[in-house]
Amino acid sequence: MNQTRVFLIFAWLMVAVLLWMEWSREKAAPTPAPTTTSAPAAAQSVPGANPGAIPSAQVPGAPGQAAAQAQASATPASQRVTVTTDVLRLVLDGGRVLDAELLQFPQTKDEGSPPVRLLTEDPAHPYSAISGWASEDRNTPVPGADGFKLVGDTKDFVLAKGQNELQIPFVWTADNGVTIKRTLTVSRNEYAVRFKDEVSNAGAAPWNGYVYRTLDRTPTILSRSMTNPDSFSFNGATWYDNDKKYQRRAFKDYLEDGTLNQNITGGWLAMLQHHFFTAWIPQKDQTAHYVLSQVAGRDLIEARGPAFTVAPGQSTSTEARLWVGPKLVNLIAKEDVPGLDRVVDYSRFSMMAVIGQGLFWVLNQVHKLVGNWGWAIVGLVVLLKLVLYPLSATQYKSGAKMRRFQPRIAQLKERYGDDRQKFQTAMMELYKKEKINPMGGCLPILIQMPIFFALYWVLVESVELRQAPWFGWIQDLTARDPYFILPVINVAVMWFTQKLTPAPGMDPMQQKMMQFMPLVFGVMMAFMPSGLVLYWVVNGGLGLLQQWWMTKRHGGEPVPATTAPAPVKKK
């Protein structure tokens, strides 16, 4: 296999991958088909027991079950509470977070653009986070998600200047003497909202109940296209446990592989979209039952448990964090949650994710030095070129030597005409005699392929690059080049690289395909994020310089075609 064919295979492989991505998105239904889940019968009970026990996997219950139970108690009228910090604006209603705005992330770069709304009450695509209590016994009073009453008269909480923490207190009290105090805590420059529930039993009988935490969403219809970066990223539910690690389920085939039904200790659940995510993170030492479900067209992922039996005169507590925010690597790391870094979804495959995380770490270090994400991409490419130089040198030396013997190869092709077998045999004899390794260019490309694909997802997924400028006309590295300057430069770089690439034994069809390859890539790159095209241009430009220098240094004068061709061994 010669270098031209390797390049051709690599190029068409990329095209095939991108076309497959596009096809898979177009094939998917825009939203799940609406289904209805009825409330469970009274006989379908949860065997709540000692602290740490979890609800049965047999119960199909959803937040609606707990809400129905709560009707037996005095459910207060809607009490909307607004909480504003330096980074978040939340709207709460009992145990529901109905709306969440990310104040430091405008929707567009236009002046006065509203902030990104991650959770929303939009009737077409509602998206909320819910935390409530249910019980094994439908006669046991529980707050559900709607029974919590705000303590005090303040309905608008604002984190004041110089204040680092803000607490919002709620309470639910039953006629049997059971009280659940809920405290929500928000902190400066944090997207994790801390929930703490304290259960006290001042009654005469034990009280059984379990906490549930749910993400409930009707997925937004995306414009599925290679020109829409939002459709590149994974959109769906994810969860993590210490045994099976990171798992995920796309909205488009939400229940295709079942409803999960898995007991997990110390895990978490989330819903991801491009650049942002929402996640429930229970206590590390507590076990919950994780369930996927669909209710009236809404996709839900829920952690049920742990369950508690609280004896008279006793109390217990449980805590969780609700993350509502961007996929900022440094802030996610501060939460110290195993596997939470995987929400920056570089790949569903662990090896590719590790490569992506490593590449972003290097990119981030370069950014700290240069202070600009565009120049950080350039710096990352330079570092990768230096690290991979030994492999590239082998590739270019092999190419230079093959280019030197182009006249001989052309003579062999002319001599054997359409007899491909004899031509290939003679060419391999020539390679053997002159100590040319035709596979010398393959290994470097194969090694660089996973790096390229991982870097592709790093540039697509990293919210740090969102609306980040480079210089001049590039004011958003996650948007396409508005004037197509980088794609045109990329076409030129590929064309010159093609001219320097040796092409022994290429037939006319391959030659035509190679001539169109720069144009195909140019059209494809024209609508991709400019940060990715910048990487491709710098990487290709440096590769072109390396190849030109290696060809000049190691190529030498072409071997004249008058030299007798290598003999063909007859079998």
Curated annotation (Swiss-Prot):
Assigned GO CC terms: plasma membrane
Under the heading Pfam families, the entry gives: 60KD_IMP (PF02096), YidC_periplas (PF14849)
Outline the subunit composition: Interacts with the Sec translocase complex via SecD. Specifically interacts with transmembrane segments of nascent integral membrane proteins during membrane integration.
Q: Per UniProt, which keywords does this protein have?
A: Cell inner membrane, Cell membrane, Chaperone, Membrane, Protein transport, Transmembrane, Transmembrane helix, Transport
Which stretches are tagged as biased composition: Low complexity?
34-43, 55-78
- Of which family is this protein a member? Belongs to the OXA1/ALB3/YidC family. Type 1 subfamily.
The encoding gene is yidC
The entry's function note states:
Required for the insertion and/or proper folding and/or complex formation of integral membrane proteins into the membrane. Involved in integration of membrane proteins that insert both dependently and independently of the Sec translocase complex, as well as at least some lipoproteins. Aids folding of multispanning membrane proteins.
* Transmembrane feature ranges: 4-24, 369-389, 440-460, 483-503, 518-538
The organism's taxonomy opens as: Bacteria, Pseudomonadati, Pseudomonadota, Gammaproteobacteria, Lysobacterales
Entries under NCBIfam families matching the protein: PRK01318.1-3, yidC_nterm, yidC_oxa1_cterm
Listed GO molecular functions? Answer: membrane insertase activity
Membrane topology, as annotated, equals: Multi-pass membrane protein
Is the keyword Transcription assigned to this protein?
no
A Gene Ontology biological process in which this protein takes part is:
protein insertion into membrane
Name the segments for region: Disordered: 29-78
> InterPro entries under this entry?
Membr_insert_YidC (IPR019998), Membr_insert_YidC_N (IPR028053), YidC/ALB3/OXA1/COX18 (IPR001708), YidC/Oxa/ALB_C (IPR028055), YidC_ALB_C (IPR047196), YidC_periplasmic_sf (IPR038221)
Q: What is this protein called?
A: Membrane protein insertase YidC
